[in-house]
A protein has these predicted regions:
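Low-complexity, intrinsically disordered terminal/linker segments enriched in charged
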Residues: 119-145
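Hydrophobic/aromatic beta-strand elements that line small-molecule binding cavities or substrate pockets
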Residues: 68-74, 105-111, 124
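Hydrophobic pocket/interface hotspot
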Residues: 15, 26-27, 34, 46, ...
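Short, low-complexity N-terminal intrinsically disordered segments enriched in polar/charged residues
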Residues: 1-32, 140-145
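Exposed beta-sheet edge and beta->alpha loop/turn motif
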Residues: 85-113
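Short, well-ordered beta-to-alpha junction loops that form the rim of enzyme active sites
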Residues: 84-86, 122-123
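Short, solvent-exposed loop/turn segments at secondary-structure boundaries
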Residues: 40-41, 80, 94-98
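A solvent-exposed, acidic/Ser-Thr-rich amphipathic alpha-helical stretch
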Residues: 24-77, 85
Length: 145
């Protein structure tokens, strides 16, 4: 697959669309030997481990929405850096929304090879609902989310 660099930003947007839809076609965006990182999962390799990550998240997350229209997307060669926000709900019924709750901000680093994701690193706090009270070292009062 031949892809020009500006198309890589669109491929990153497509990743978020498929992720939000829970589409099995999400895996098609990844190279067979893709490497990825997600907090508390660690580093994974290949589509089988990626499916394991997605299945685990699907067991906890009821819905998630990425509004890519406001994202900061930076292209550097075959790498796309994305700073963005999410909103969603956990299967427990707890909800999160950036600006309203502590969870919801993230940064992804996509490295593309041959028009596919060859490496993806996701940096976020996976405590979407803010359950980890001990992690709020400065307290919750007076904070902007």
């Amino acid at each position: 697959m031949s892809t020009s660099n500006p198309d890589l930003i669109e491929l990153a947007r497509e990743y978020f669309r498929r992720l939000d839809a829970g589409s099995p076609a999400l895996l098609e965006l990844f190279a067979e030997d893709a490497e990825f990182y997600f907090p508390k999962f660690g580093v994974g390799r290949g589509r089988d481990q990626l499916l394991e990550l997605i299945t685990g998240l699907g067991g906890a997350i009821e819905s998630i929405e990425h509004d890519t229209s406001a994202y900061k997307m930076t292209l550097a060669g075959d790498t796309v850096f994305v700073e963005g926000t999410t909103r969603g709900a956990l299967k427990s019924g707890e909800r999160w929304a950036v600006g309203e709750t502590p969870g919801g901000r993230f940064c992804n680093v996509f490295e593309f090879r041959g028009g596919l994701i060859g490496r993806l690193a996701v940096y976020l706090d996976p405590d979407y609902a803010g359950r980890d009270e001990a992690g709020f070292l400065w307290g919750r009062q007076g904070r902007s989310w």
